[in-house]
């Protein structure tokens, strides 16, 4: 008999990756429409946990008005003789996996940024109470992580209680992150990988190092090491570093080998500390995005909770579409907030000296880790809402990026006379170098123009297709 025989909907890995659109949603918890939401796991002593207890503080699912968004706190307390405090982040991240095992439920993100949807179909089938979801969690946790001997779960929907616990949760996350700081990538012989999000991004492999947290911000190197130890066949695994090919970009032979295998050959190389070339892939649960702004040759950072437009006129959701899915896209880099505190943060791209715009809420959280001479030179949404305003701010504040513009302009000016030097009128052989220029015509098709030993100056070029060709 299945351990989910009494559950009104299906439960299993087959439902992972299910996307629930708003029109098919019965209720939504968290997400952009709600300010306060969280999921938190705490390790307790054996006598502090009542095994199997499920508590709901506030209205249950069946008592909520449909087609609305609500605050939600998921607070799980676990105990066991082998359960250690360093496992909290690992257990917590499994909430994402187990929620997606439930037919008609979609879970994205983590920690203080959760986004959950319940479909109309599953509600109609009888999935109308957190008691049911709690039972599923408890059975999955105990089945897949048998070191958990006792587990009690509290669901909070009362907005005031969620807000109260939200502040407590933030302090717990910070304490957990602080424990992981200090260790350097060069000091360990192995990194860790995570494929927990492959149900949404099949080619994504998260590489977790001491100085590069998981994109979701929920798993440190210590968390990953503990997870791989207690669940060696689980989604978190050890990666032998191998040879360091490039210490600045962060390329390792061992990482390349594992990522190639785990991505089914789609991703061949990874540079851990840059947003260009072969950047680390992104799933969909990243806390923030580093995005390149070509007009200023610098990076903007935007987090999931930012509801306004970025200076390039695009919101987080649109940038996320360009970043997620397990792809390597130059200039779009999914990151965690904790990675922004790392000395390896965009190391190959110039680090914080290349960052020009960050939402004030995030800047406040990481300002103690930004070089002091840069803190007031980085614009926020209060300083610049357009690229032009951003340029003016950077010049007025003397951001280092301005010097970069000046040096680039000087280099271009120095190269210009050489480029414009007239060529002697000497006949060139047919074997001389040639340049091919693809020219698009309409939606599909095109011509290929080959220029041989030619220097062309034109204010305007017009190409017209001849009739019948």
Segment roles from a protein language model:
Residues 132, 136, 411-432:
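Glycine- and charge-rich intrinsically disordered segments
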Residues 407, 411, 415-419, 444, ...:
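N-terminal charge/polar-biased segments
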């Amino acid at each position: 008999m299945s351990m989910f025989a009494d559950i009104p909907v299906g439960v299993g890995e087959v439902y992972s990756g299910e996307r629930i659109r708003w029109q098919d949603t019965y209720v939504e918890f968290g997400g952009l429409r709600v300010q306060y939401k969280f999921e938190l796991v705490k390790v307790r002593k054996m006598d502090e946990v009542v095994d199997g207890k499920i508590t709901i503080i506030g209205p249950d699912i069946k008592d909520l008005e449909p087609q609305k968004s609500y605050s939600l706190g998921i607070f799980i307390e676990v105990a066991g003789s082998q359960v250690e405090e360093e496992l909290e982040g690992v257990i917590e991240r499994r909430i994402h996996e187990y929620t997606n095992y439930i037919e008609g439920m979609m879970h994205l993100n983590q920690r203080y940024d959760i986004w959950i949807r319940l479909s109309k179909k599953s509600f109609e089938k009888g999935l109308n109470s957190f008691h049911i979801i709690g039972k599923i969690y408890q059975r999955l946790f105990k089945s897949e992580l048998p070191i958990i001997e006792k587990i009690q779960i509290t669901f909070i929907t009362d907005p005031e209680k969620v807000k109260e616990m939200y502040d407590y949760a933030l302090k717990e996350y910070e304490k957990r992150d602080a424990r992981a700081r200090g260790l350097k990538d060069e000091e360990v012989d192995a990194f860790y990988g995570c494929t927990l999000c492959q149900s949404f991004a099949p080619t994504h492999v998260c590489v977790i190092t001491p100085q590069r947290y998981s994109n979701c911000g929920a798993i440190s190197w210590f968390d990953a090491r503990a997870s791989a130890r207690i669940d060696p066949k689980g989604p978190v695994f050890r990666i032998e570093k191998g040879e360091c090919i490039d210490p600045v970009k962060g390329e390792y032979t061992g990482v390349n080998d594992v990522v190639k295998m785990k991505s089914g050959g789609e991703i061949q190389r990874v540079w851990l500390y840059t947003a260009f070339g072969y950047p680390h892939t992104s799933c969909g649960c990243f806390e923030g995005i580093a995005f390149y702004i070509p007009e200023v040759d610098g990076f903007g950072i935007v987090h999931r909770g930012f509801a306004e437009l970025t200076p390039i006129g695009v919101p987080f959701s649109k940038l996320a579409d360009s970043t997620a899915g397990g792809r390597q896209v130059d200039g779009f880099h999914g990151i965690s907030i904790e990675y922004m505190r790392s000395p390896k943060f965009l190391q190959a791209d110039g680090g914080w000296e290349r960052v020009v715009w960050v939402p004030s809420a995030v800047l406040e959280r990481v300002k103690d880790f930004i070089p002091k001479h840069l803190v007031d030179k980085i614009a926020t949404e209060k300083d610049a809402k357009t690229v032009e305003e951003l340029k003016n701010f950077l010049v007025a504040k003397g951001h280092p990026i301005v010097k970069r513009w000046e040096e680039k302009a000087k280099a271009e000016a120095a190269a210009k006379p050489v480029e414009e030097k007239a060529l002697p009128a000497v006949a060139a052989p047919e074997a001389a170098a040639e340049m091919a220029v693809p020219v698009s015509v309409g939606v599909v098709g095109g011509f290929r123009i080959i220029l041989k030993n030619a220097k062309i100056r034109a204010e305007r070029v017009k190409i017209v297709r001849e009739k019948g060709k």
